[in-house]
Structures are given as C-alpha cells and as structure tokens.
Design a protein with these regions (language model features):
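Glycine/proline-enriched, intrinsically flexible loops and inter-domain linkers
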Residues: 1-181, 185-309
Length: 309
C-alpha cells in the first residue's frame, strides 16, 4: 500500500506538503513505515502556487486524509485521475509524486535488508535504544539550564489582509528539571486568512527543532546524536485553542512560514540570558515567496515559485 496525507488538522505541516507513507512488514506483521514529505508547487488552491487571503482550508486545494494511492500493490486509478485533474501543473505534481513513491520504496527495501541481516527483534531493540539515547542527551542538556520561566515577545506585521493590525507573539519557556514547556499563551488569536499555523504539524515541530538546534547541534556537539523522536519527548508545547498557533478548523493554515520562524526566534531570545553561548542574534524570522504563473501558447498552465529567505 501507499498512503497520501496532507491534512493540516491531522498532523501535516501544511497542505502543499504531501506525505507519502508505505508500511514495512515482517512475517505479515506491521513493524514500521517508510515515509517522506515533499512540497508540491500547486495543489489546486484558489490561486496558483501559494495562498494567503483565502477564507478556509478548502480554498487551499486538495485535502488528502490518509488516502491510498496504491492498494495491494496496484494503482488506485481514480485517485491518480483526481490529483491530475485538480492541479494546474499535472506534469510537475505527478512526476514529484512518482519520485516520492520511489524514495519510499527504497526506504522499505533498506528496512527489509536490515531485518533480513539482523532479525526483527534486534532491529526494533536498536531503534528503541537510539531514541532513548537521544532523549537522554536532550534531557541532560535541558537540566543544565536553571529552572525558571523565560519570556520574550515579538510581533508579525499583519495577516495578509488587514495591514493596519500587527499580530502579537508571546513565548514563555518553562524549564523544570529535564523537561521544558513552550507556552504561547497571549499570542494572536487565529486570523481570517491562511496566516495560521497547524498545531501538530508545524507549531510543535518548530519547538522541537529549535531545542535540537540550540542544545544538540550536529556541528557543535562533541559526539554524534541521532536525529529521532527521542529529542521530542522532554518538550511540551502549549497554545490556546483558537490562537494563531492552534487554530480551529476550518480556518485556513497554509501560510505558516513567518509565524513559526518568529516563534523559534523568540525561544532563542527568551533563553539568551541564561545560555548565551548557545544562542544566536535575532534573525529576520521571515520567509517570502513570489509565485509566477500563466498559460503557454500550447494551452498548458505553468507555475513557478521563488523562495527568498
């Protein structure tokens, strides 16, 4: 089987990021998954490329809620046709999906090779040990930070529609022993455009990322720390339901770039006074896109995205 998923209220980072997930079996028992995510240039939203000023998540384009593109090794042709018919650039999107599938298939193959070489029990044990090890290292770094509540505030220029209203962002980093909570209470309420952030797929992930980058950076650490779920375990994230970082469906949540960068920047700012050696200066905390599109003389649509950081 091959599953597609991009639903912003069910774990996806935002709707253009489509995940391809394939199961891995051992003796007909499910033991894991091979998965990847890719940003797709156009998924049939209200405007070509990327969007901001739209009323709800349905205007973001195709919402794929863990649907099967392959089942039992066979293509689910109606879904392939649906995707092809609902993007402005089917050649690009279908080609990228095929590449994702090939990547996931390679992951399944490599996983199966490990199982064949070492046996299921040893592979699963090793995976768990690696996650436990990374968790242990993350907790050890958190424990070096004095207990306390560390706060920082910032803002976003606007929601893409009402240019007269800035959006407050407030961060409180609560350190308690080997655990940390990032509390976003006081940040802007959700907005009526796509300038909201999927909580599970982006808000929480931004918090996981910033602590990994600050405390277990690959280049500054003295030893190799595996990248895995273990580093997430000591970190909790709190954002009031109905806020920009935890919107209520069906609010649009496609344009979530600047918000999570501002949030990460404020976490660093909050902790700067107590761990200055691991903190960076403030950054632009923004990401801008320019989307170009049109119709060729042949009648084919074209879409091009330029990313500026």
């Amino acid at each position: 089987d091959c599953v597609l998923h991009n639903h912003p209220y069910k774990g996806a980072s935002h709707s253009p990021d489509i995940a391809v997930v394939m199961p891995v079996f051992s003796n007909e028992k499910l033991i894991g998954f091979s998965a990847n995510t890719a940003h797709h240039v156009d998924i049939g939203a209200a405007t070509p490329g990327l969007i901001i000023d739209v009323p709800d998540m349905w205007a973001e384009g195709m919402l794929l809620d863990a649907v099967k593109l392959y089942e039992g090794g066979k293509r689910v042709e109606p879904l392939w046709k649906y995707i092809k018919d609902n993007t402005r650039v089917p050649g690009l999107v279908m080609g990228d999906l095929e590449a994702q599938i090939a990547s996931a298939e390679l992951g399944v193959k490599r996983f199966e090779e490990l199982l064949s070489k070492y046996g299921k029990d040893d592979v699963i044990t090793a995976c768990n040990q690696l996650m436990d090890y990374t968790e242990k290292m993350m907790r050890a770094e958190i424990e070096k930070i004095p207990d306390g509540d560390y706060k920082a505030e910032g803002f976003l220029d606007d929601d893409g529609r009402d240019r007269s209203k800035t959006l407050p962002i407030k961060v409180c980093v609560k350190i308690r022993g080997s655990e940390v909570e990032v509390d976003l209470t006081g940040s802007s309420e959700q907005v009526p455009t796509a300038f909201n952030v999927p909580f599970d797929g982006s808000t929480k992930v931004a918090a996981f990322f910033v602590f990994r980058a600050m405390l277990l950076d690959t280049y500054s650490s003295n030893e190799y720390i595996p990248q895995n779920e273990g580093s997430f375990r000591p970190i909790k994230v709190k954002a009031p339901l109905g806020s920009i970082f935890n919107p209520i469906a069906p609010a649009a949540a496609e344009a979530r770039f600047c918000q999570i960068q501002r949030m990460a920047d404020l976490v660093i700012k909050a902790l700067g006074p107590v761990i200055p050696e691991k903190s960076t200066a403030g950054n632009a905390a923004t990401l801008s896109f320019a989307a170009y599109s049109g119709v060729r003389p042949s009648g084919d649509y074209w879409v091009f995205l330029e990313v500026n950081e």
